């Protein structure tokens, strides 16, 4: 089951305290106006995919062809564009916005980004080599990589040999990271541990390929329009429930008032009856006294 991933901006790292008192280091990712810019179908393009755009770019710094693409999609110019392959059933309409509820707490994801550049580094830092001995005849070459091959045969260094060179600034994917918390109102996704890239860098988040597809995942995606519709329905349901409760309270008040009025009338009738019965007895006593 293939569904769309998301484009997020790396805000930084912090920690969260759980209910049991444990603290978990998390990386905070932010969804910045993540919208569908285009979609590819099997009929027109030969495959199914959605193109997402995130961030906001100045129109004057956007090329004319890209301005046409954004205008066709009726979205503002985006800073980052990424295409995600999806199943035909999980295509999303152009212009829809994806929110942080796309993932849920406890779900495993794969995060891809550009690692922090380290420049030219030696073999010990770049490949975790142990280096040479600190003494016993080793001079100057303590942090060198040592031998790079054989002798006259083959007479060359094999391609791909681990040596000193440029480190970092490469596309890296970290797999099976766990979602700790999401914040839809602020568009935040908090992932346990570190993710590739520096602060302010763009990363892509996808469902983990080495884990079973979660049964409670939202298909085709968690959309802002669907959330707004659900909130509207919930508000209408709450208003209807409040009106029903108010009507029920009014009915109960009317019944109570009617019951009180009936009991009052019954009490007045009993008092009147007692008064009418007591009047003749008083007159008889008066005559006996005379």
Curated annotation (Swiss-Prot):
Signal peptide boundaries: none
Chain positions covered by the region annotation Disordered: 250-290
N5-methylglutamine, modified sites: 152
Entry protein name: Large ribosomal subunit protein uL3
Species assigned in the record: Jannaschia sp. (strain CCS1)
GO biological process, one term: translation
GO cellular-component term (any): cytosolic large ribosomal subunit
GO MF annotation terms: rRNA binding; structural constituent of ribosome
Protein family (similarity comment): Belongs to the universal ribosomal protein uL3 family.
Gene coding for it: rplC
Modifications made to the protein after synthesis: Methylated by PrmB.
Positions of transmembrane segments: none
Top-level taxon of the source organism: Bacteria
Subunit and interaction comment: Part of the 50S ribosomal subunit. Forms a cluster with proteins L14 and L19.
Gene3D superfamilies tied to this protein: 3.30.160.810, Translation factors
Role summary: One of the primary rRNA binding proteins, it binds directly near the 3'-end of the 23S rRNA, where it nucleates assembly of the 50S subunit.
Keywords: Methylation, Ribonucleoprotein, Ribosomal protein, RNA-binding, rRNA-binding
């Amino acid at each position: 089951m293939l569904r769309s991933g998301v484009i997020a901006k790396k805000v930084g790292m912090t920690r969260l305290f759980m209910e049991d008192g444990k603290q978990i280091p998390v990386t905070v990712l932010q969804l910045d106006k993540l919208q569908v810019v285009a979609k590819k179908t099997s009929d027109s393009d030969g495959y199914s995919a959605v193109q997402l755009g995130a961030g906001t770019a100045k129109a004057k710094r956007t090329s004319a062809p890209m301005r046409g693409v954004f205008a066709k999609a009726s979205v503002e110019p985006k800073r980052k564009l990424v295409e995600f392959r999806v199943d035909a059933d999980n295509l999303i309409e152009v212009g829809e916005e994806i929110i942080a509820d796309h993932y849920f707490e406890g779900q495993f994801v794969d995060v891809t980004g550009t690692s922090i550049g380290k420049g030219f580094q030696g073999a010990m830092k770049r490949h975790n080599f142990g280096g040479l001995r600190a003494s016993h005849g080793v001079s100057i070459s303590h942090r060198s990589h040592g031998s790079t091959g054989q002798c006259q045969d083959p007479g060359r260094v094999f391609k791909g040999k681990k040596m000193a060179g440029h480190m970092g600034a490469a596309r890296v994917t970290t797999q099976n990271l766990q979602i700790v918390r999401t914040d839809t109102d602020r568009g935040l996704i908090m992932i346990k541990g570190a993710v590739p890239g520096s602060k302010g860098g763009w990363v892509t988040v996808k469902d983990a390929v080495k884990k079973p597809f979660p049964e409670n995942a939202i298909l085709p995606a968690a959309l802002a329009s669907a959330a707004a519709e659900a909130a509207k329905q919930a508000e209408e349901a709450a208003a209807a429930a409040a009106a029903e409760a108010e009507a029920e309270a009014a009915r109960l008040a009317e019944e109570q008032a009617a019951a009180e009025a009936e009991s009052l009338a019954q009490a007045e009738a009993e008092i009147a009856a007692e008064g009418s019965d007591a009047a003749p007895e008083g007159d008889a006593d008066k005559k006996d006294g005379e």
